[in-house]
A protein has these predicted regions:
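Signature of N6-adenine DNA methyltransferases within the class I
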Residues: 24-25, 29-38, 58-66, 78-80, ...
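Glycine- and acidic
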Residues: 20-25, 54, 148-151, 360, ...
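Class I S-adenosyl-L-methionine
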Residues: 1-77, 84-103, 116, 121, ...
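Short, solvent-exposed loop/turn segments that connect beta-strands within catalytic domains
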Residues: 76-79, 237-238, 373-374, 405-407
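Polybasic, glycine- and aromatic-enriched phosphate-binding surface used to engage nucleic acids
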Residues: 282-477
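Extracytoplasmic/secreted proteins and extracellular or luminal domains
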Residues: 76-77, 124, 201, 317, ...
């Protein structure tokens, strides 16, 4: 029985013995064998190299180390391998020790660190050729020691998995390679902006692996986040990125390469899973404007209901103005008041603090920040033509011009553009979640002023959008 099979048997044994609630508290999800094999296969193993220093932070039972050692020895049987496993969970360390003993029996030099990875990693002078990791998943408070430790080396991290990624990058030798399986969420959004910019300036992403089904990646542990594997090395930017996708843990459906600039930008990381995604990014980028160049802005509604209960009104009494909620919006349509809604429909304008929550009368494009599971689209937009001042709930974004309404033709054109199949597909490529933030909308390309006005009056906006994007007739968006 080889070391990988034995390591997998230990992982299965540990899964049965470990307490699920404690695993959740630790953010611990043991890597399935098939996923570990994918990860180790993605690592660059240079020809002619005979010394390898490997680090596995948060090693668990050691399945990643085992598959990495197995891969290197299969290519370089005489290689000298040094592995460092870092693990603090006393419940899995006995399994990890046995995996390290198996590695040692093959001539591998092993080291087990039972110290907190962040504390150890900040203080060590060691550097590695390979960092392979499945880091813990949980948020960090702003005053967490981990946050301060990482800030001292120039990284702003909002959670533990980004902290592990950041420190892993710091511990790489020049041309060293890091492979990490994490939630996809770090690739876009303001929450990760600082971390993302620093990470992609320190490392060059050259491989990304995605899974079509969220639930099959860590199905034993019921992880439902969108998970992604990213490989990156400490060196000059790669001209291309290799993209691969699995339908489940065991089957790599397709691998292809795309130009680096189509995946990694200054602001975010696109993850086009297939050729159709590549095409939709290329097509939507034919639209050359954005909100800023159109002279418009997008903001998030200012009314947070539970904080302003004293200003919420159940009836349209004197001094009330409309309060727009997500339930008031369907694609292209605003219904207010919505009498069958359980959400408050009116807002008190007579309070001395009310003015800062209210927008002037005018035309606005409202966009849901969150979409329900039953809604087919990520982006749901509608035009609201306000004859009087109004208030917008915090679960809505709204497009405006310096805090006031916008031209009604432009508003109609923008709503039709945002509700199009093409923009919906484009948004899915760069966003791994259903939340639509104001930052996301600022990044979306838009047609010109004249094209938006044309869309507003179009009898067939879908056809006109195809023409704007120069899409060949045979190409369709699913």
């Amino acid at each position: 029985m080889d070391i990988v099979t034995r390591a997998e048997n230990r992982r299965q044994e540990a899964l049965l013995a470990l307490d699920r609630n404690r695993q959740s508290e630790l953010g611990q999800f043991l890597t399935p064998l098939a996923v570990a094999r994918i990860m180790s296969s993605m690592v660059r193993v240079p020809q002619g190299k005979d010394n390898f220093y490997i680090l596995d932070p948060g090693s668990g039972t050691g399945i990643l180390l085992a598959t990495m050692v197995d891969r290197i020895l299969s290519k370089h049987p005489k290689a000298k391998i040094h592995v460092t496993a870092v693990e603090t969970d006393e419940n899995v360390i006995p399994y990890l020790r046995k995996t390290l003993e198996d590695c040692k029996s093959l001539g591998v030099h092993t080291e087990l660190i039972t110290q907190n990875f962040i504390d150890w990693g900040i203080s060590t002078s060691k550097q590695y050729d390979v960092v392979i990791q499945n880091p813990p998943y949980y948020k960090l408070s702003a005053n967490s020691p981990t946050v301060f430790s990482l800030k001292n080396i120039g990284y702003i991290v909002p959670n533990m998995y980004s902290a592990f990624m950041a420190l892993g990058a710091e511990l790489l030798k020049p041309q060293g390679y890091q492979i990490a399986i994490t939630p996809r969420s770090w690739m876009n959004g303001t929450y990760y902006t600082s971390f993302r910019k620093r990470y992609i300036s320190d490392l060059s992403i050259d491989k990304i692996h995605t899974f079509e089904s969220r639930s099959t990646v860590f199905q034993e542990s019921e992880v439902l986040q969108e998970i992604i594997i990213v490989g990156a090395y400490k060196g000059s930017v790669s001209p291309q990125v290799e993209l691969s996708v699995s339908r489940d843990q065991n089957h790599i459906q397709v691998t292809r390469t795309v130009p680096y600039g189509q995946v990694v930008t200054d602001d975010f990381v696109f993850v086009p899973a297939n050729y159709e995604d590549d095409k939709i990014v290329e097509q939507v980028n034919q639209a050359r404007e954005n909100l800023a160049t159109l002279g418009l802005q997008v903001s998030t509604g200012k009314v947070v209901g539970f904080r302003l209960k004293n200003l919420l009104l159940s009836e349209n009494i004197i001094g009330a103005c409309p309060l727009l909620q997500p339930t008031n919006i369907a694609t292209g349509i605003v219904e207010h008041p919505k009498y069958d809604s359980k959400k408050t429909q009116w807002f008190d304008t007579y309070n001395e603090t009310s003015s800062k929550y209210i927008v002037p009368a005018g035309t606005y494009v409202l966009i849901k920040r969150f979409t329900a599971k039953e809604e087919k689209r990520r982006i749901v937009a509608a035009v609201y033509n306000a004859a009087e001042p109004a208030a917008f709930d915090n679960k809505l974004n709204y497009i405006h011009c310096s805090g006031e309404g916008i031209d009604i033709e432009i508003a109609e054109g923008i709503a039709r553009w945002l509700n199009s199949d093409q923009v919906d597909a484009y948004f899915r490529v760069f966003s791994g979640h259903t939340q639509v933030n104001a930052t996301d909308i600022r990044r979306i390309p838009f047609p010109s002023d004249s094209q938006l006005r044309g869309l507003a009056h179009s009898e067939d906006p879908g056809h006109d959008i195809v023409n704007i994007l120069n899409i060949p007739k045979e190409v369709k968006v699913a």
